[in-house]
Amino acid sequence: MEEKGHAFTRSEGEVFWFNPDHGIYLTGLRQLRQYMNDCPRLPKDRRGKTDIQNKWTKQIESLVDDDPEFRNKVVHTTYRKIAFKNGYYDCEKKCLCHYNRQVYFLMKGSIDYAPQEKKVLDEVWNKLFLGVFGDADVSTFMKNSFARGMAGEIKDKRLFFIIGEPNSGKGTITEAFRLVFVSQFNTLDAKDFCAKKSDGNSALSNQHLVQGR
């Protein structure tokens, strides 16, 4: 499988599998069963049996080496790269690249990347930035801040704080990003981090939103 571009690694007790068909590192080996069923190197009369597949899966898991640098690789190899459905955009090379096992993405984008015409870029700039913030310098700062956040140029790649007055436009722009990058980007109101004397906990109920990049 490694000859076909697959890779297996272990971190903190979890096994991660890079499958070229998916392009990212996913936990678990459940889908190995499909490969076992189709593998010509395995005995034809045994490769489809569940108990045999269970044993093979456990054996494969035991052979996977632990990588103490895995979490660091997730951060550093995806630096200045933005995940899309059809590949990742490299902000340094300024082009779309194919997913590969040397780049440790754990999530894939929900939309395809496609170069846009200048008139589309101008429309986005005028409506979502200049039209919201009203000042070219502020708009440029906000655009660059979002770009750096999406490309990993922040210490914590999970959370990016935007500070501003009510009705300043920050909600509009973050909602636009959430709609575009559905699988990676979510908005979370700062008040959800505040302690509240109630029978519920808004921060706890919304903790899944922080899982976006």
Language-model features, listed with the residues they occupy:
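P-loop NTPase catalytic core of nucleic-acid-dependent motor ATPases
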Residues: 6-22, 26-30, 76, 88-211
